[in-house]
Regions:
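Protein-protein interaction and targeting regions used for scaffolding, dimerization, and localization
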Residues: 2-220
Length: 220
């Protein structure tokens, strides 16, 4: 058994992705670049919204979450701007490796669609242990728990963004631009999580970590 993160994708978004994949594999000559760029940006935003924004909205009574939500909106805006733009450069044949890579991350279960990525067992056990310490009232565990949470999220960024980006083999200028966007957005998110460590109490930290753990489960 392996541990993986399961992130829900809306059925209509998945249906659009599946349709584009079918068009590409059947050799349809009509360009799929714009449609694919839009659907991938929606997938990315759905993932970010369910992991972060829903959590922050549950804790709106804490003033710190307002600043967090602004950071997340910046990230969503960058995704909606740059992902469709980056995909638009390519003909259909160049899109197939990317679509096939991403299709392998999708998992259907009980009429629900998940985008998944694996997490090393050691990291999974560490964050679960850290969560238990927070639940037991260990205030000193807050910073470590949020750091581990950042590590789990970054594994997802690598598996779902950095690695599939390689499939497209961008030219130097575009690749450098996209790397800058990825680095900027992840830095914003990770710095915000780090800052939260000094602003929230143990109980709220436990809520944050436990919420994310709900996305992690065993995968056969």
């Amino acid at each position: 058994m392996k541990t993986a993160v399961f992130l829900n994708i809306h059925a209509d978004t998945y249906a659009r992705f599946a349709h584009i994949r079918t068009q590409l594999l059947q050799g349809n000559k009509e360009s799929q670049a714009n449609a694919l760029g839009n659907v991938l940006s929606e997938m990315a935003c759905e993932v970010i919204e369910q992991v972060f924004i829903v959590l922050l909205q549950q804790n709106q009574q804490h003033s710190q979450t307002g600043e967090s939500e602004k950071v997340i909106q910046q990230i969503l805006e960058a995704i909606r701007k740059y992902m469709p733009w980056s995909i638009s450069f390519f003909g259909n044949d160049r899109l197939i490796p990317l679509v096939e890579y991403l299709s392998k991350t999708l998992y259907l279960e009980d009429e629900r669609i998940y985008m998944t990525y694996p997490v090393k067992q050691q990291l999974a056990e560490q964050i679960q242990a850290s969560s238990q310490k927070l639940i037991q009232g260990d205030h000193a565990e807050i910073l470590k728990a949020l750091k581990l949470l950042t590590e789990v999220i970054d594994v997802g960024v690598t598996h779902l963004i950095r690695e599939p980006k390689k499939c497209l083999k961008f030219n130097f200028v575009v690749d450098k631009t996209l790397n800058g966007v990825i680095n900027m957005t992840t830095h914003l998110g990770y710095k915000r999580l780090e800052k939260l460590g000094s602003q929230i109490d143990q109980q709220l930290a436990a809520t944050y970590v436990d919420y994310f753990l709900k996305f992690m489960r065993q995968q056969a």
